[in-house]
């Protein structure tokens, strides 16, 4: 009997990527092979995104392609919450499940393509860190599912539910397994990382025989003992974040904080139902930088939110200049089906949204360029992601750069035979542009 094969398409954010990794790991554990193309697959799983309309369309297109090329498709992920929308376009999909519905996906796979008999997962070994879709040297670590906030532009709680934190012992054991597998950078992700453990009332758990609370600070402190890069994403500026800044100042975790501020106008923040006030946030940033001078702050913002006036937008620009954030992403507001913001009055015309986006990015580009110029002459440790095909250049990142969303450090004039992805290098920064740094190699620190 031939081994059944399952094709897999993964769309969406890093949190969805982790969901895909878990499903793939379970498929492998149950004896399935992962097909490299549609033709060789007995069925195809499509993990969808449904956050904004463009992502919904991309997901529907991916389902359509899988149906056309294979014809036996199981749909999961955030868009799976809206089964009617999926079946309206693709009525013959085998099964539709929601986000993080690992067991439902596996039951559907077993139903339509039974697992091979006499499979022994202890003989057909699955790596202890599971199947990963990222390069070997970094990995995403999802610590919770869902969110307790009800931001008016977001439908995540309707797709993924309220906050459910993983037991801290499980989180830390996964992190330790990743380190044993050679991972040198862990990116901590969730919908609201700093709320970790709130739903469990900070329940006591155990790791390596020691008691650890299911709590943001305690988890970060334990992760800091692993001796690898730990990067925090999707953090709200709650008061208890201050204590984690101390860990960064001590070198326990990377001095990098990803906080989606979204706006700075108090009026717009209120319309968004965001749990932060811009003046308090500026004070927080000042305090954090006093504690940890090399702290890098990344954030994302939405311009053209319904009701945003020119005055609101100018408040945002002024705040941006004062905050001097290191890394920034910006999006024009896009209506999301099911978001309560759609019902707000005074929607901003598309041409004004675009004009504000361009003005915003121009201001931030100047801030970013000035900050990177100050790096010239500094010695930094960087992690190599890849090597250029045609040039003697290593594409790397420093502590200030998360993969895929931030800039790179291009280490020039290297001997490519001595360096490979996952190596840690010590470099001197020689030049900079608006988003990237250029460097020369001092030495290879670790391989």
Curated annotation (Swiss-Prot):
Q: Where in the cell is it found?
A: Cytoplasm
Tell me where in this chain the Radical SAM core domain is found: 133-370
Q: Gene Ontology terms, cellular component aspect?
A: cytosol
Q: Which residues form the TRAM domain?
A: 373-443
What Gene3D superfamilies would the database entry show?
Methylthiotransferase, N-terminal domain (3.40.50.12160), Nucleic acid-binding proteins (2.40.50.140), tm_1862 like domain (3.80.30.20)
Q: Where is the MTTase N-terminal domain?
A: 4-114
Query: Pfam families attached here?
Result: Radical_SAM, TRAM_2, UPF0004
Stored SUPFAM superfamilies: Radical SAM enzymes (SSF102114)
Q: Which residues of this UniProt protein bind [4Fe-4S] cluster 1?
A: 13, 49, 78
Primary localization: cytoplasm
Q: Which GO terms describe its biological process?
A: tRNA modification
What PROSITE patterns does the annotation carry? Answer: MTTASE_N, MTTASE_RADICAL, RADICAL_SAM, TRAM
Catalytically driven reaction(s): L-aspartate(89)-[ribosomal protein uS12]-hydrogen + (sulfur carrier)-SH + AH2 + 2 S-adenosyl-L-methionine = 3-methylsulfanyl-L-aspartate(89)-[ribosomal protein uS12]-hydrogen + (sulfur carrier)-H + 5'-deoxyadenosine + L-methionine + A + S-adenosyl-L-homocysteine + 2 H(+)
Iron listed as a keyword: yes
CC cofactor note: Binds 2 [4Fe-4S] clusters. One cluster is coordinated with 3 cysteines and an exchangeable S-adenosyl-L-methionine.
Q: Which family does it belong to?
A: Belongs to the methylthiotransferase family. RimO subfamily.
Give a short account of what the protein does: Catalyzes the methylthiolation of an aspartic acid residue of ribosomal protein uS12.
Identification of the protein by name: Ribosomal protein uS12 methylthiotransferase RimO
Q: Which organism is it from?
A: Acinetobacter baumannii (strain AB0057)
Q: Which gene encodes it?
A: rimO
């Amino acid at each position: 009997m031939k081994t059944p094969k399952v094709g897999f398409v993964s769309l969406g954010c890093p949190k969805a990527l982790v969901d895909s990794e878990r499903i793939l790991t379970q498929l492998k554990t149950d004896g399935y092979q992962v097909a490299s193309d549609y033709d060789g697959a007995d069925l195809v799983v499509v993990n969808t995104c449904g956050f904004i309309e463009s992502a919904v369309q991309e997901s529907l297109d991916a389902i359509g392609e899988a149906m056309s090329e294979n014809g036996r498709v199981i749909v999961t992920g955030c868009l799976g919450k809206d089964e009617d929308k999926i079946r309206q376009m693709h009525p013959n999909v085998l099964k539709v499940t929601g986000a993080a519905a690992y067991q439902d996906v596996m039951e559907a796979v077993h139903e339509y393509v039974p697992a091979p008999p006499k499979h022994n997962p202890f003989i057909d070994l699955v790596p202890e860190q599971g199947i990963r879709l990222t390069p070997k040297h970094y990995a995403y670590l999802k610590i919770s599912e869902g969110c307790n906030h009800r931001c008016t532009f977001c439908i995540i709680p309707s797709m993924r539910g309220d906050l459910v934190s993983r037991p801290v012992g499980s989180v830390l054991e996964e992190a330790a397994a990743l380190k044993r597998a050679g991972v040198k950078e862990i990116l901590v992700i969730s919908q609201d990382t700093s709320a970790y453990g709130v739903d469990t009332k900070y329940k006591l758990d155990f790791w390596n025989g020691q008691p650890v609370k299911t709590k943001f600070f305690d988890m970060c402190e334990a992760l800091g003992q692993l001796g690898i890069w730990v990067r925090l994403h999707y953090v709200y500026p709650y008061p208890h974040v201050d204590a984690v800044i101390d860990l960064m100042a001590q070198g326990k975790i990377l001095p990098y904080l990803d906080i989606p501020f979204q706006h700075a106008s108090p009026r717009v923040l209120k319309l968004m139902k965001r749990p932060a006030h811009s003046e308090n946030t500026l004070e927080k940033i000042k305090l954090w930088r006093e504690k940890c001078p090399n702290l890098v702050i990344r954030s994302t913002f939405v311009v053209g939110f319904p009701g945003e006036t020119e005055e609101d937008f100018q408040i945002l620009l002024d705040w941006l200049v004062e905050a001097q954030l290191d890394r920034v992403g910006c999006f024009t507001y896009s209506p999301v089906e099911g978001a309560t913001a759609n019902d707000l009055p005074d929607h901003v015309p598309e041409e004004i949204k675009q004009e504000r986006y361009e003005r915003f990015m121009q201001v931030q580009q100047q801030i970013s360029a000035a900050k990177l110029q100050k790096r010239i002459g500094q010695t930094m440790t960087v992690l190599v992601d890849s090597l250029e095909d045609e040039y003697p250049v290593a594409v790397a990142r420093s502590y200030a750069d998360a993969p895929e969303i931030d800039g790179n450090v291009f280490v020039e004039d290297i001997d490519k035979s001595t360096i490979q992805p996952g190596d840690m290098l010590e470099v001197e920064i020689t030049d900079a542009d608006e988003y990237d740094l250029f460097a020369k190699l001092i030495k290879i620190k670790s391989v």
